[in-house]
Swiss-Prot record:
This is Large ribosomal subunit protein uL16. HAMAP family: Ribosomal_uL16 (MF_01342). It comes from the Bacteria. Keywords: Ribonucleoprotein, Ribosomal protein, RNA-binding, rRNA-binding, tRNA-binding. Binds 23S rRNA and is also seen to make contacts with the A and possibly P site tRNAs. Belongs to the universal ribosomal protein uL16 family. GO terms for biological process: translation. Part of the 50S ribosomal subunit. NCBIfam families: rplP_bact (TIGR01164). PROSITE patterns: RIBOSOMAL_L16_1, RIBOSOMAL_L16_2.
Length: 144
């Protein structure tokens, strides 16, 4: 599971998810990737489930890059507890994802394998995504 080694504050405000992603909108490391089309929180468990789905389908071929990190703690109060009496205990970690952000990248496999692996990974995520190639977004191809 992905989580920060240490944080300055154990609890954070929820914040707003307005606008599009500022950075990380292009495929830099691999040849193929999946790009978020919606804004959402993605938990560390969902990221891990997507990673496992991809790597199992690729059967140890190729390389996977995870471009998001769950650095935001979210809290929850126990069930059947009255309102008030402070903020709840930290429950888990989430990555804030905005539209346009590339979530995962793959290289070292054919386009068909990459497309299917990323499709399987996208089913583990709570948002709509689209398959993107390095050339489509405007970067240069690695093949030279």
């Amino acid at each position: 599971m992905l989580l920060p080694k240490r944080v300055k504050y154990r609890r954070e405000h929820r914040g707003k998810m307005r606008g599009r992603a500022k950075g990380g909108t292009e495929v830099h490391f691999g040849e193929y990737g999946i790009q978020a089309l919606e804004a959402s929180w993605i938990t560390n468990r969902q990221i891990e489930a997507a990673r496992i789905a991809m790597t199992r389908y690729m059967k140890r071929g190729g390389k996977v890059w995870i471009k998001i990190f769950p650095s935001k703690p979210y809290t929850a109060k126990p069930l059947e507890v009255r309102m008030g009496s402070g903020k709840g205990a930290p429950e888990g970690w989430v990555a804030v994802v905005k539209p346009g952000k590339v979530l995962f990248e793959i290289s070292g496999v054919s386009e068909e394998v990459a497309r299917e692996a990323l499709r399987l990974a996208s089913h583990k995520l709570p948002i709509k995504t689209k398959f993107v190639k390095r050339e489509e977004i405007g970067g240069e191809s690695n093949e030279s």
